Amino acid sequence: MDANDYPRLYYTSMPSSSTSMVTTTRFSTSFSPSIPCHRQENFRRHSTSALAKRNGSESEKSAEIRENPDEIEVSRVSGRDSSLAFYTTAHETSSMLSRDSRDETLTPNEHIHQASSRRVSANDSVFEDGYVDFVDEPREHGSRRKSFEKFTDRNGEEKEGRVFELSTPQPTREAAPGAHQFQLPTLLVTSTPTTVFDHSDDEVWTPYRPPPNREYSSSSEPMMGDLTFRLQSGIHKKSIAVEGTEIALRDLRNEALQFIKEIYPEKGCSSLEDYILLYKHDLRSINILQLITTSSDVTDGTLVEVVIGSCPQNERIVVHPHTLFVHSYKVPTFCDFCGELLFGLVKQGLKCFGCGLNYHKRCASKIPNNCNGSKQRRPSAIPLSPSNSNILNLNERRHSRRESCLEALDAARPSSTLGGAATPNIFITSDDCGDAVGGNYLQMPRKDRSCSWSGRPLWMEIAEATRVKLQVPHTFQVHSYKLPTVCQHCKKLLKGLIRQGMQCRDCKYNCHKKCSEHVAKDCSGNTKASQFFLGSQADDGASEDRDDDLSLRSGSGAHKKAQNTPSAPLQGSEGSGSPGPVVSFAANALSNMPDDDVISSESANIPLMRVVMSKKQTKRKNNKLLKEGWIVHYTDQQNMRKKHYWRLDTKGITMYQDENTTRYYKEIPLNEILNVSMSPPDKTADYLFEIRTGVCVYFISGSPSDEKGSSLDAQSWTTAIQSALMPVTPQSSVVGGKRIDKLKVPTEGETGHLGAKIQTEHEFSQLYQIFAEEVLGSGQFGTVYGGIHRRNGQHVAVKLIDKLKFPPNKEDLLRAEVQILEKVDHPGVVHFMQMLETTDRIFVVMEKLKGDMLEMILSSEKGRLSERTTQFLVAQILEALRYLHHLNIVHCDLKPENILLNSNSDFPQVKLCDFGFARIIGEKSFRRSVVGTPAYLAPEVLRNKGFNRSLDMWSVGVIVYVSLSGTFPFNEDEDINDQIQNAEFMYPPTPWKEISENAIEFINGLLQVKMSKRYTVTKAQSQIWMQNYTLWSDLRVLEKAVGQRFVTHESDDVRWQAYEKEHNVTPVYV
């Protein structure tokens, strides 16, 4: 490359006399592509003769500038002739300071101001465009100048600032004769951007600040408007005027995009808007270029720098690795990730050099890479290494760019796919220079160095950033901590001996009860299922209130941006500041508890939840596509042939206009199809197969292209439709490659195991249509699906039992539920409709209801029911049990999931279902077998002792307890007798202080360990809690709606009617 091809640099030398002419000397700059442009130090002198000219003419200078319009001129006043100051860029030379002598020429101080105003931090991304800034003046070799902290501005006011400290330039010889190479100084200390000092004569230079609307280029004339600002990109500028006092960010980006397209018309980019960054020039800040994040950043006279990034900004993930090293703590300190105490005498944990946070060694591999590098006080013993010297301005830059980084993370999430597509670009801050613990690794003591202590790997950051974020609230419950733990929200100690605080049962986030209301809704889910994502919502931009979301907490639930104040050792009332054993620390902490911080009064029992054994009603959103294709068809009512694109799914057949549209001509639900058959073998029929419904018959004559494969295609269509009509594909009964022992499968026409006539699945499919995607529940012997009766359209629940899953000795278990359902007939028991048996399966058809009692409890406002609603439901349950016990039928698996509701009202009718565990037990008989769900079983069953019908009454007591409190009554870790005898444990003030004593007495009568002391159904119905006028009135309203009196008795009418007259109550059941 020829020297003339380099960007040009002008040198100006002025004696102290103000009448001297300004002489310019042309320099060419040399840059190496392998070295960052702001680290370049070698400049080649292009003309040695020009350097000797100290009194050149102004016309020479003007001619040089006109000849080289891309060159820069920088002037500087000095008491010596050889002072030097210049400024350039690597990729394209800026002409911000270029002036023709006949135009408005800047004063030397103006040049100084312009040169210093373009100084930016090395941390800023604008260095991707290669800004360079050097200042030099002659002095003796090796000399160092002291800093001047005070200076006088042009108004005579004294101000404070920082100064340049430079090395001495050393001329070196080059191979080419007559040429010299200068090693330019290296900037060590960043100065105040608007202040330049001359140390040669200890004089102070006052920079010139130009007016806001002063134009430096006439590339575009400004328009008249209320808001005027300028766009700049390299040597190009443009003035923009808009109406109003603000411009929207979208309009500003559009103006910048149009500006770039105008000045670079030959450069085409399909998604240029993704690469554009907008900065404003702010001379008052340390970083001159400030990222524009809001419309208020652009004011009248603002200079907007348009920067084109190297990668799309919506694919960048900002990663700030922690600088961890082993640390010995002299006072008790807590982990900022899990909140537990760092145990040990020495080397208890890890401390981040950047942000000062403290972690367990076991937590090091789980913490997010979100260090903010803002430790309040950096130890003076550890100096800044060159690789980390640019961290000085890190806080200011991140403060101004915090929200832009968050928005970049939000935009980056959908860019990563599972199929191996391009992953988002990762921007790692300069804290991490390749070593495992950060840039200061070599400056730590050797004994504290470690190559294993680092945050989670980058692939986890990518997976976390691209993961869909939802506002999932924490599920807090009272927890007793065995180790001293701090609240991860307020960073204060959780005090007490037991039940010190609240812990999320999913992500194990710990906090005070009073702080639980202020914790962000960012639960990360079960920690056992996702070990490596225990708090990975770093830089989450989903929440609009980012200032709150980025508040001072870090924990297992969601590890936010690291806080400025880490978990410091407890002081004052929170603990003794002196080092000592953990025992004395805990004792001091407990003795200093304030009065207002009392131990939580909530129950430590397990919250009510759906037991794994039963499924909640689910339904897939998208039906499975079974077959599709073009079909030509007609009906028995219309002979005109029509062509449509048929799609067969689990719900029906849909006829679309074409393959891609969503508009359809007609839909045939599967429950309306009565039969599908091929055409007769004779050649008289002009169709391939027919679909018979209750309204008409569809004849399929083929596909639009009548080929040889039409008959084969017709066969596949009939097979697919018949498969869709079949109830459910039977599950395999093969285990480990060998078929298990099964019941003897009778042939068609024989009597089945349950005494029912064997029927084919085709016959069953003609009566009922089962929706395989609508699973209502799953029990011991089978799965319950939703279905519909084809003829009358009644919705039913079909329990499908696979006989091949049971060995021969379990045949009685298959027969028990069907026999009980056939035997009972009561409004409080689910209605049995029909039972059909095929060669390998049994179909039990029952009525379908709206939901279950558990769903009603969980969906209530407080997570529990009121006493009035609970009394209403329990009264119906007791009446159904009274009927079953009269028939010597014990349910044995009574729980809210098996109590169905026929409506979504506040006072619905309930019915008992799922008699898979039911037993026939006499009044004085006992059974010994495995039955029921452990959470609702009586102690005698859990201890494998004999049980009788009082087993159901224990289950009723548990149901009443969970309905009123929303939690299970017992904790599995303690003996059940001890828990029952401990009234404080069983009935904590929250919420039992709001519940009547009669309700507690009713529960105590049912939850009796001794069966002889447990309430019977009759005694429970006559208990005082179940005897009040409001309950009787509500039940009478229900009976009126059902049309049958099945809960209350006529003998009670006289008593309650007298109550109405005595209290002047108007009955609502009439």
Swiss-Prot record:
Modifications after synthesis and translation: Phosphorylation on Ser-925 by tpa-1 is the dominant regulator of catalysis, phosphorylation on Ser-929 by tpa-1 has a lesser effect. Prolonged phosphorylation results in ubiquitination and degradation.
Residues holding ATP: L776, G777, S778, G779, Q780, F781, G782, T783, V784, K799
Regulation: Activated by DAG and phorbol esters. Phorbol-ester/DAG-type domain 1 binds phorbol ester with low affinity. Phorbol-ester/DAG-type domain 2 binds phorbol ester with high affinity and targets the kinase to the cell periphery, enabling phosphorylation and activation by colocalized tpa-1. Both domains 1 and 2 appear to bind DAG with equal affinity so may contribute equally to translocation and activation.
Cofactor: Mg(2+)
Top-rank lineage group of the source organism: Eukaryota
An example molecular function term from Gene Ontology annotations: zinc ion binding
E.C. code: 2.7.11.13
Protein kinase domain ranges (all copies): 770-1026
Effect of S929D: High basal kinase activity, loss of phorbol ester-stimulated kinase activity and ability to phosphorylate pmk-1
Protein name: Serine/threonine-protein kinase dkf-2
Annotated source species: Caenorhabditis elegans
